[in-house]
Amino acid sequence: MTVIAALRPHSVDLAVFVHVAGAMILVGGLVTAAVAGLIGWRDEANGLRRFSALTLFAVALPGWIVMRVGAEWVYSKEHWDDLPDKLQPTWLGIGFVTADIGGIVLQIALVLAGIGVRRARSGGGAALLRTSAALAAVLLVVYVVAVWAMGGKPS
């Protein structure tokens, strides 16, 4: 028998909404930061690269926090923590790994962006801002894989 759809309890709806909203904000912030940083790659004025850094701080970081809080909320409400690690589905592991490692990479990108913005005031920092934008693009690819895993739920 093939499962066409699965239902979950309505008590989890708000937690899932918070998780998905945070993920959408995070991905939107990463798209904006990556595109602005890559378009402004050769910009001598650093304007787009600074906008990219600001987007990481103001959009992507809060989105990551909301996404992670929502994920933990769903995890506890669905009682996934009661299962042995062997029985937890692959998509859940993909989500945790991408969120945790992605959070570390996001923090590295934020530190580089912050130092780059500070140095940009005195005429430098372009390489740090470019690296921050490149990390945002890498994170975007990683989180697209996570969105696929969460949506498609392979095994």
Language model: regions and residue ranges:
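Polytopic transmembrane helical bundles with strong interfacial aromatic enrichment
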Residues: 2-155
